[in-house]
Amino acid sequence: MKAIAIVGSPRKKGNTEFLTNHTLTAIAEEGMETELISLAGKDIRGCNACMVCREKETCPIDDDLFPLYEKAKAAEAIILATPVYFGSATSNIKAFMDRAGYIAGAERRFAGKIGGPLVVARRAGQNFTHAQLMYWFHILGFYMAGSTYWNIAFGRGIGEVEQDEEGLNTAWNFGKNVAFLTKKVHG
């Protein structure tokens, strides 16, 4: 069984990637295969609502999305991770959500998978962003793993999130719950 985490930060090796790796370590400890996929530097354009994906499982936009969609489709668990940018999810994670959601949604291809969000904020916007990602999991039929608090940690400068002890514990427990649910549903 495999869990993938798609990190929507445009920065590699930043706070969101650190928090996501922390969560993936908790999942791997439970015997699952894990993979972090960073969207930093990837060419993923926004959806143009052409609806080709409603007819067949493809997208006519020629960029880096479809191989990532295939990895998501093959995984039993998917985590979406994003920093808060201007009170919301980043544009690249949103483009992934829109397009992968449309491609998968028509035939409920993600239904029954395990999922959940991870959010990193400086000081605000985290609740809306967390909900924004949760709605994606909800509408696509995921079983969502919870934790001991919202799956949120705080930090702005690179490495600051490592000081958020409660955020790290929450992310760790979230990872354990992702693994538990995945084994129960797909084991």
Where are each of the predicted segments found?
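A short beta-strand-loop structural module common to alpha/beta enzyme folds
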Residues: 32-42
